[in-house]
Amino acid sequence: MKELQGYLEIYRSRQQDFLYPLLFQEYIYVLAHDHGLNRLILYESMENLGYDNKSSSLVVKRLIARMYQQNHLIISANNSNQNKFVGHNKDFYSQMILEGFAVIVEIPFSLRFVSSLEGKEILESHNLRSIHSIFPFLEDTLSHLNYVSDILIPHPIHLEILVQSLRCWVQDAPSLHLLRFFLHEYHNWNNFISPKKSIFIFSKKNKRFFLFLYNSYVYECESIFVFLCKQSSHLRSTSSGALLERTHFYVKIEDLVIVFRNDFQTILWLFKDPLMHYVRYQGKSILASKGTPLLMNKWKYYLVNFWQCNFYLWSQSGRIHIKQLSNHSLDFLGYLSSVRLNPSVVKSQMLENSFIIDSAINKFDTIVPIISLIGSLAKAKFCNVSGHPISKPVRADSSDSDIIDRFGQICRNLSHYHSGSSKKTSLYRIKYILRLSCARTLARKHKSTVRAFLKRLGLELLEEFLTEEEHVLSLIFPRASFILRRLYRGRIWYLDIIRINDLANHQ
């Protein structure tokens, strides 16, 4: 990165950031290879091509020239996999260059992110990228709010608009032309972003490149929206420029162009709200407010018009669902989140008179959707649709310890992810299903009964299904099981989780 930064500093005096020449630098492809996306295709294919230098600029020049040949862009349905270049599939060379191009177009954003961290005391930024970091924020804010809008970010976007949105970041024309070529090529291959319900599915090839495009598109969608939220709030929030979110782009904007003030004064008057909060996750976003239903509907129709006018997307109002937190639950990252009243009675004594005061406090609840989770376990053949554990087919050469480790790891992962649940009963039931399914699998393998295996293994099988924290506490308090129950009755948000659990992703 220091070498790239030094290269770009030369052109900063001319107020230009030329990225296209970097495409012919060999270390770019080394960086692309080190990032772990399609690791073997670049080196192995170059060896097959017969070149000593794995990523020479001569090879890249030839590949780019070959890509721009008009007759090669014609894709026939009957001959889609037969076009070869030096004995390889037609998409190999564009695949190779696209890997390097994905690294190059990220450079302006990476440099801006590095400069934003200067002078800020952050030791390990990856600790701030946990999915669970969202929940403490919601726990502190949602209990004071009334309404929430569950928003599905519209897709797909027109390819040319993606190029236009990157012009303010990538300023040299050759890079933009090459980007336009890649987008239209993948558009013909039907390998671009495709919707599957509410989740964006990216092409398995060049996932890094498409994730970059999607993040830049969402960044563009949020730029004006975040500005409006800041200007419409009486309590100005501090920009979280140093906090990394897994699904967010590199850094939230510190300040937007001052020109926006004059253009949106009327809009700001319509959306004046002291408490407005915004969270994005998995192609969705949440807009929560303490306002009235009228205000939430204003935001709803403003967002629909904003998407249609700025991105030429026909977005229906059904993509935005307004819910009252006191009456509806929010399906959020594998949890059912809601705000409920927690009643309490306080007795007050004043001299000879006593008073009983009834009070209610809003409490943020996170519950594991047990029905959906059992459905996921049933789909994975751990139980039937009713939640009754069944034996899972395994390979004949699998050892007992491997089977137990596999079941135990799944159980620990689920317990770790859903540790923030308000009620642990659902987790206990999931542990029971996995433990008994493991016992039935072992009994089926050895043609024995479940009772015999449980009697023979006993506590050893139980220990495999304990989390690391439970195991440590059981060693410290071997005779105080009630302490364990008390400690694990509350919510625990582990901040080392960077992606949603596969079984928790019911959508």
Curated annotation (Swiss-Prot):
Q: Which InterPro entries match?
A: Domain_X, Maturase_MatK, Maturase_MatK_N
Q: What is the top-level taxon of the source organism? A: Eukaryota
UniProt keywords, alphabetically? Chloroplast, mRNA processing, Plastid, RNA-binding, tRNA processing
Q: Which GO terms describe its molecular function?
A: RNA binding
**Known Pfam families for this protein?**
Intron_maturas2 (PF01348), MatK_N (PF01824)
GO process terms (BP)? mRNA processing; RNA splicing; tRNA processing
Alphabetical GO CC annotations of the entry are: chloroplast
Chief subcellular location: plastid
Places the protein is found: Plastid, Chloroplast
* Record PANTHER family: MATURASE K
Main function = Usually encoded in the trnK tRNA gene intron. Probably assists in splicing its own and other chloroplast group II introns.
Give the family, as the similarity comment puts it. Belongs to the intron maturase 2 family. MatK subfamily.
HAMAP family per the UniProt record, alphabetical? MatK
Protein name per UniProt: Maturase K
